[in-house]
C-alpha cells in the first residue's frame, strides 16, 4: 500500500498511573481552572490527550448512570408504590399510605364493583356469609337486613317486590301476591344462585323452592282442537306414524277398509275419511292394531257384489310360483329379468316372454303404489305380499 509522505506518529507511553493523574485533574476542574502546563508532564500529543480525557469522562458518566438505576430499583422493590428517581422517598411513602387508607375506608357496595356472587333467587331464602368468620347465616328477607356481602347490595332496592315473592307459600293470599310478583322478576333472579353457600342447607331450601319452581316452570297448555274438528290431509300425515293403518271406531267399517285394501278396491271418494275423535284415534290404532287387522281379515264385507269375493287370494297354482320366482331377483338366470327388458335384452329373453301377465305387471305395480299412497294403509303387509295377492287374484279371473 503506498503511503507517500505519511510518517508514523511517535509511540505513546501511557499507563494507568497517568490515567489516574489525568482523572484527578479533571475531577477538580469545578473548583479551580486547569493549568495548561500540567499537560506537558504527560509527554503526549494534544490529540491523544483530548481523546483520553473524553474516554475518562464517558466512563465516569456511565458509572453514575448505573448507580442511579440500582438505587431506583431498590426503592421500587422496598416501597409499595413506584417512586420516581427525581422525588424523595418520603413523599412517595406518604402518598402510598394515603391511597391504602382511602381504599380501606371507602365503602364497596356498588353494583358494578363486587367480586361477590350474583343475587340469590327470590324463591330461596337469602344466605349471607359473615366476612370475619367463615360461618353461613340464613336470613329471611322479611325480617332481616340486607346481606353484608358487596354483591347483594341491590336486594334493598327491590325490597317490596322481593318480599312479596318470599312470603310463606301455605297461605292463600300470599300465593296470589307471589303469582302477581313473579312475572316482574328478571332472568338473573329466576336463575338459581351458583354460590357455594347454598349447599349448607339443602333440605330447607329445596323444600321451600319445589312448589315455587313448579309454579314458575309450569308451561301454558298447548292448543287442543275440539273433539269433532276436521283435519286436513297434511295434518294427518304429520300426526300419524308412517305405515300405520287407519282404524275407525266401528269394527265393521274398519273391516271393510282393510279388506278392500287387500283386494285392491278403489276408494269410494277421492278424499280420505276424516277423523272423528282426533288424537284418541291414534292411540286406539296403536293399541288395537292386531285385533282390528285380524278381525278385518276374518270378517267378510256385506256386499251384494260377488265380483269382490272372487278376487280374494286363493291357493297358488303350481305354475304360478315358477313364474313369480322367474321374475324375482333370484331368478334372473332364467331370462325374466326386468332390467333386461328395459335396457339390452338378456340371453334368454324373446318376444314370447312378453305375455299379458308380464306386460300388465308394471301397470299393476303403479296402480297399487298410488292406491296405497292415497289410502295411507301400508303397515301390516309388505309391497311384495300385496302385489302377490293382487297378481294371483287377477290371474285367477
UniProtKB/Swiss-Prot annotation:
Null allele phenotype: Significantly decreases the radial growth of colonies under nutrient-rich conditions.
Biased composition (Basic residues): 269-282
Amino acid composition bias (Acidic residues), ranges on this chain: 230-240
Subcellular location per the Swiss-Prot or TrEMBL entry: Preautophagosomal structure
One Pfam family of this chain: ATG29_N
InterPro entries referenced in this protein's UniProt entry, alphabetically: ATG29 (IPR039113), Atg29_N (IPR040666), ATG29_sf (IPR039362)
Family that this chain belongs to: Belongs to the ATG29 family.
Role, per record: Plays a role in autophagy. Functions at the preautophagosomal structure (PAS) in order to form normal autophagosomes under starvation conditions. Also plays a role in mitophagy. Autophagy is required for proper vegetative growth, asexual/sexual reproduction, and full virulence. Autophagy is particularly involved in the biosynthesis of deoxynivalenol (DON), an important virulence determinant.
Protein name according to UniProt: Autophagy-related protein 29
Species: Gibberella zeae (strain ATCC MYA-4620 / CBS 123657 / FGSC 9075 / NRRL 31084 / PH-1)
Source species taxonomy: Eukaryota, Fungi, Dikarya, Ascomycota, Pezizomycotina
This protein's encoding gene: ATG29
